[in-house]
Regions:
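Cytosolic regulatory regions of ion transport systems
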Residues: 1-213
Length: 213
C-alpha cells in the first residue's frame, strides 16, 4: 500500500485525498487550520494540525517514510516554496507541488519538487477539449504529449470487432478498456463494439482532433 502525505487541505487537497483513499492508498492529511482538520478528522484516520514551514513539524511526520509528499498549499506561493525546500532537506522520496503557472513550476522544481501539477490549468484544458469535441467524455494527461481519452464509441465502429476497426493505423490510438454499462473490461481483439459503449484509449494528446465530432 502506497503512503502519501498531503500538505494543504483546500479543494485540491481534499479531492486528491478522497481519490487516493478510493484507490486504497494510506493517506496522511495536514493543514495549519485546526477548524479544517477538525472536520477532516471524521473522514481521515491520519489528519493533523501543523505548520509545515517549521522543521520540527515535518520531523514529527517521518517524511522519509512516505512514498510521495504533495504540497497542495493554496494561494501562498512563498509557503509552498518553503515547504517544498524543507521536504527535500528531510529526504522526501518524491515531492509533487501545486503550481499556478510555468514560473511557479520552475521555482518549485529548483526548490526540490520532482514534479509540479497545474490543477486549474488541467481542468480548463479538459473543459475546453470537451466543449469542442462532442464525443469526448474525459481525458487524463499522462505526460505533456500523451493522454488517456474516454469517448463515445464512434459510429463507424459499432457492430465491428476491435481487430477490424483499424484504430491504431487510422487514429493512432491504443484501446485499453471499454465501458459496457456498469462494467469496465479489457477488450479482446474479437470484442464487438455496441452503440452504447464508451472507449478508453491511449495516444498522443494531439490525437483528439481525430475523434472530434
Amino acid at each position: 500500500m502506497k503512503s502519501i502525505l498531503i500538505i494543504g487541505m483546500g479543494e485540491f487537497g481534499k479531492h486528491l485525498a478522497n481519490r487516493l483513499v478510493e484507490l486504497k492508498a494510506e493517506v496522511c492529511v495536514v493543514d495549519k487550520n485546526k477548524d479544517i482538520i477538525k472536520v477532516l478528522a471524521e473522514q481521515f484516520e491520519n489528519a493533523y494540525v501543523a505548520d509545515c514551514t517549521q522543521d520540527i513539524a515535518l520531523r514529527d511526520f517521518g517524511i522519509h517514510n512516505f512514498d510521495a509528499c504533495v504540497v497542495a498549499v493554496g494561494k501562498d506561493f512563498q509557503t509552498s516554496l518553503v515547504i517544498t525546500s524543507k521536504l527535500k532537506e528531510q529526504k522526501a522520496k518524491y515531492i509533487i507541488a501545486k503550481a499556478s503557472d510555468d514560473l511557479q513550476s520552475k521555482f518549485l522544481i529548483m526548490a526540490g519538487a520532482n514534479e509540479t501539477v497545474y490543477p486549474e490549468k488541467d481542468v480548463a484544458t479538459k473543459i475546453a477539449q470537451k466543449c469542442i469535441a462532442n464525443n469526448l467524455l474525459d481525458m487524463f494527461a499522462i505526460s505533456d504529449d500523451y493522454s488517456v481519452f474516454e469517448f463515445n464509441v464512434l459510429d463507424e465502429w459499432v457492430d465491428k470487432a476491435l481487430k477490424n476497426t483499424n484504430i491504431r493505423a487510422k487514429y493512432k490510438l491504443n484501446v485499453v478498456a471499454v465501458r459496457d454499462g456498469d462494467d469496465i473490461i479489457a477488450p479482446e481483439a474479437d470484442y464487438i463494439f455496441k452503440a452504447t459503449d464508451t472507449v478508453f484509449a491511449f495516444g498522443k494528446t494531439s490525437t483528439i482532433k481525430r475523434i472530434i465530432k
